[in-house]
């Protein structure tokens, strides 16, 4: 990612910071688990349609005090500090980098707000030698588990689409977008929602992987054409198919994203706002605008707040495919963000269901 692109991203996303945190601060004040009216509005009975809720959201944003809408006087100082924090930096001993980052996660903060090692970690993730490679078969999408120098494990997700390609259809259409993982990482850092894995773009050499790095199982899910000029990968996952293999370029390079493998254990839960993934069948939350009333006795106050925050984050990246979510030390983390940024021409408002059903 060039410096110009990063500055542009920071400039655009900074404008969203005030809106997101104003919404969160304002609406959370209405969320009280001791009340039976979660889902009711202070202005009367909750509207029974998604469009009605969206109208209420816009109305409340317009009613915010100017202090929540003005740019922070410290904006430029903070922006420059964020930029410097994520600029790749040189290092001497990669083992030291792995050791330091291993102890970063705390609750659902997967990395510190500011740390001089971050730039070194990003540099190491994109440049350290790949020692071995194998399939990472869990989940629905193709990904690889790579071992880098110093025994560091990382996940690699490949590039399926050009950056400007529009994915039509439902919000969950298409394969994972590798750049969505990268953008989610930087957006989380800007919003101080440091719940996503550290991510950076990288190219891998499929010929080198096939001939030198892959284990037997991975090699069995790779193909080489007759004259040995094209190396392809279809991997192993729920939706992986040999006829949908992805191939390297003329130099056998495949672009994608490297995701730092967060240490520790995670718990996985089905999202209360999971979709049915069927055109003719709605999920309970899509039919009942008071759906949150059924959750207030099942989920803790902090869990509901985390899921509301997640919905705002997912709306900003337009990820409507969070059918499950993970927790670390009982706090929600954002491990899979690959279905973001599919269609810039459509805003899928129902991603905000946890917000408008639980807080408005």
PLM regions with names:
Residues 1-360:
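Phosphate/dinucleotide-binding and metal-coordinating scaffold of catalytic cores
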């Amino acid at each position: 990612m060039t410096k110009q692109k990063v500055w542009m991203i920071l400039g655009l996303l900074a404008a969203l910071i005030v809106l997101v945190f104003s919404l969160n601060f304002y609406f959370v004040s209405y969320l009280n688990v001791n009340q039976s009216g979660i889902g009711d509005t202070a202005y009367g009975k909750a509207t029974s349609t998604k469009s009605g809720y969206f109208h209420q959201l816009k109305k409340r944003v317009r009613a915010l005090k100017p202090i929540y809408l003005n740019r922070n006087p410290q904006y430029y100082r903070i922006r420059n500090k964020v930029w410097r924090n994520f600029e790749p930096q040189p290092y001497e001993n990669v083992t030291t980098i792995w050791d330091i980052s291993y102890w970063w996660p705390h609750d659902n903060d997967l990395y510190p707000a500011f740390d001089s090692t971050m730039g070194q970690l990003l540099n190491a993730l994109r440049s350290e030698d790949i020692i071995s490679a194998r399939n990472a078969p869990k989940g629905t999408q193709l990904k690889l588990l790579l071992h880098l120098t110093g025994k560091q494990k990382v996940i690699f997700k490949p590039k399926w689409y050009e950056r400007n390609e529009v994915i039509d259809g439902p919000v969950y259409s298409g394969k994972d977008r590798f750049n969505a993982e990268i953008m989610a990482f930087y957006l989380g850092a800007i919003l101080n929602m440091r719940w996503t894995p550290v991510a950076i773009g990288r190219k891998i050499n499929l010929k080198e992987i096939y001939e030198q790095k892959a284990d037997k199982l991975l090699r069995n899910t790779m193909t080489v054409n007759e004259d040995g000029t094209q190396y392809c990968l279809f991997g192993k996952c729920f939706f992986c198919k040999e006829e949908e293999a992805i191939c390297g370029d003329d130099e056998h390079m495949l672009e994608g994203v490297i995701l730092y493998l967060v240490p520790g254990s995670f718990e996985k839960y089905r999202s209360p706002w999971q979709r049915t993934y069927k055109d003719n069948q709605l999920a309970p939350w899509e039919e009942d605008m008071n759906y949150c009333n059924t959750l207030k006795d099942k989920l803790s106050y902090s869990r509901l707040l985390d899921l509301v925050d997640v919905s705002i984050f997912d709306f900003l990246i337009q990820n409507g495919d969070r059918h499950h979510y993970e927790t670390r030390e009982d706090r929600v983390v954002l491990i899979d963000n690959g279905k973001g940024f599919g269609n810039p021409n459509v805003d899928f408002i129902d991603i905000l269901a946890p917000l408008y059903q639980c807080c408005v």
